[in-house]
């Protein structure tokens, strides 16, 4: 079960980075008033 939890944790972290990356970039540009 430990291995499964590790895989799920890694997949969750990867998904979080994939979703948060563009969101952070969007927020940075939005706060700069570039959009």
From Swiss-Prot:
It is found in: Cellular thylakoid membrane. It is a single-pass membrane protein. The chain crosses the membrane at residues 7-27. It comes from the Bacteria. Disulfide bonds: none annotated. Keywords: Membrane, Photosynthesis, Photosystem II, Thylakoid, Transmembrane, Transmembrane helix. Pfam families: PSII_Ycf12 (PF05969). InterPro entries: PSII_Ycf12_core-subunit (IPR010284). GO terms for biological process: photosynthesis. Its main location: membrane. One of its GO terms (cellular component) is plasma membrane-derived thylakoid membrane. Belongs to the Psb30/Ycf12 family. A core subunit of photosystem II (PSII), probably helps stabilize the reaction center. PSII is composed of 1 copy each of membrane proteins PsbA, PsbB, PsbC, PsbD, PsbE, PsbF, PsbH, PsbI, PsbJ, PsbK, PsbL, PsbM, PsbT, PsbX, PsbY, PsbZ, Psb30/Ycf12, peripheral proteins PsbO, CyanoQ (PsbQ), PsbU, PsbV and a large number of cofactors. It forms dimeric complexes. This is Photosystem II reaction center protein Psb30. It comes from Parasynechococcus marenigrum (strain WH8102).
């Amino acid at each position: 079960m430990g291995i499964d939890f590790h895989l799920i944790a890694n997949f969750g972290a990867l998904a979080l980075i994939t979703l948060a990356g563009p969101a952070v970039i969007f927020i940075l540009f939005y706060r700069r008033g570039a959009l």
